[in-house]
Amino acid sequence: MKRSDLIKRLSRTDKWYLGGANRLLWAPPFPVFLDSPGFWDEAHYYNVELKPLFTWTLLNDEGAEVTLTQIRRKWDPAGIRQEYIAKLKGVSIKITEVKAVLPNDVALSEVILKPSGRRSVKVHVVAWTTQEHEPSKNTSWLEDVDYRSGLISFRRHLRPSVSPQLEVACAFGLSRPCNSHSINLSERTALQPHWKLTPWTDLFKDGCLPGDKKLTGAHSDGLVYMAVHRELLLRPATETRLSVGFAASPASQESQNNLSVALHQKDPSALSRTSWNDHFLAVPFFECSDEFLTTYYWYRWYGLKLNTEYGTEGNYKRPFVCEGIGYFRAPISYSAPGHMLENRWMHDPALAQGSLLTFIDNQREDGGFRGYIDVNHYRQEMFYHANWGRALLQLETLHPSLEYLGAVYDGLARYAAYFDRERDEEVSGLYDIDNHYETGQEYMHRYLEVDAHADQDHWGSVFRLKGVDVTVYMYELKCALAVAADRLGKSDAAELWRLEAEKIKTAILQKMWDPSDEMFYDVDPKTGLRTNVKAATCFYPYFTDIVNETHRNGVKRHLLNPREYWTRFPVPSSSCDDKYFSDAPEWKGKRMNCPWNGRVWPMTNSHIAEALASAAVMYRDESLRKRAAEFILKFVRMMFFEADPSRPNCFEHYNPFTGQPSAYRGVDDYQHSWVNDLLIKYVCGIRPEEFSVLIDPFPFNLSHVMIDDVYIRGRRLKVTVSGKRFTIWLDGKHHTESTLGDPIQVQI
């Protein structure tokens, strides 16, 4: 497999998300007009819905619509190729539309028309959009609507819900000079891409639109229809090309410039292909004999880029990865450390570094991190616990930077101080969960043990529960701060962080570990007693150095038990023997959006994979190594439709017995976990340490594995696995060979 084949490898017919890793994303969760030309279903500018973008219509010389019959569609990360057939005056016309969202926030339709037969035929292409204009309601309105030099431009003001309004400057036009145009205010009708609903069914005369701009009437509210038109003479068996584009940005001139650049390209959709190829060149190359693992590795890199934003506007000053599409199209603190773990393998660390810096840039006055950051305002109360310490140290093992450590140290120290001050009033070394939303794991039995109404209220100080997960996060943060302080020459601070981390470790071992059950449990701060509620988070200490030989049997007794967690598609977020357990997405009889009482969440699975693999390494336990490999394989295979290796997905949660995803939510490509970090560390066996790199592939029983272009501290690493042997190359030269189970330490 060649890198040039990667876009093609991911192609399929059942997908439609398009993005250029910037502000504009077209990923409608439930598209209604997918077969229509253009982009009529909703797009998102940042996390704000922007709809529609545009469609285009063919007319004959009398102004009647030429019917298009859609015959096939094929998607890949760079675009959608949609084919139609039309008939005009007895001539059959094959029409190919290539849709793409470019890195400069231009949604593009490249239209190729090719008539059959021996006669030329004239056709009119009208590209048009309809924008809501409701100034009296103060929800969505337009300003500065204008037509100039073939482009229509306008500023759209969007005020979703109670949020502050966001202004988007838009531009819309064709790649060829326009023959005519029209801008027309209308009372409301259905917002659909059907020519019969437009005002121009009566106004397109003599082969032209009226060339007017009518934006006033008895009242100002309604729909503003905007169109540009081009007449084309199609010659027999000859391709005629025309592109339609819609640009969005903060400034009108920027949108118009971006649109002009795109429309003047000979092959404008090539800008998208180049951008995606460049992205795949910027990460390690991986392939193996398991097509599920190979496909998912590259699919994951697609998902990370799809949800990346590089826009520098408002609260956003750095690049970062959003948690997902739609509502999730923002930096969200629970998922950001996972993005750091995966993006640290990119050749350039800027994106991984930006995930943390974005939250430090927007840190609260009390030291806490905001749970969700909008581009132009802050939401009140939202907060999520997250493992920033692990992500920071893992990033530093690949791309060490004193400058970066210095940039994040004070912010993370303030964050730790917030927890000590606000989340541990007993000074116990264990830290509080205040509501069931802030863990990112709502609707679980664990919270009801301290408050019977814990699932009734959402944000704020609802209850107090000393959580295993949040306490482990704080332990790893203070360990990381100790390392950072040492490297920054703050030796006294480093010693203090180590003492504080040791206090947390002791508290977890003494207060959360149940020697009889052989399980870590949350603690009720009112009684100081363990809750004895089994949740997948109870295994989180196993991915740290908190555990020792005493705890070995616990992971086997519970995690590998089919009656608790080792389901066909492990692991459920709550144990199968929990009284609130449900494999269906139901909580107390009602289907929910995000229940954690039995569904398999990729986010949990990433943590559990790390816990199981770390335990295998710590205990030097071959049976656990095999189980860890088995688990990662099951985890990845779960995220394919109908076990089809060509149709990967990543939804919020899955059924632990059937692997059925939460498709009813419409949220695919949800970056709320990490996968490629696991594949590189355990399938390929590359685990960077402070002064060396351990090469130790796990027993996945693969006939072939190859990873190349892994850059660690400026050195290039390549590893291949063939059966039970593996080989290492360093900087393009053969380094050494070994056998699975006999790891090699490479000094880098």
Report residues per predicted region.
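Active-site acid/base region of carbohydrate-active enzymes
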Residues: 288-309, 343-346, 350, 359, ...
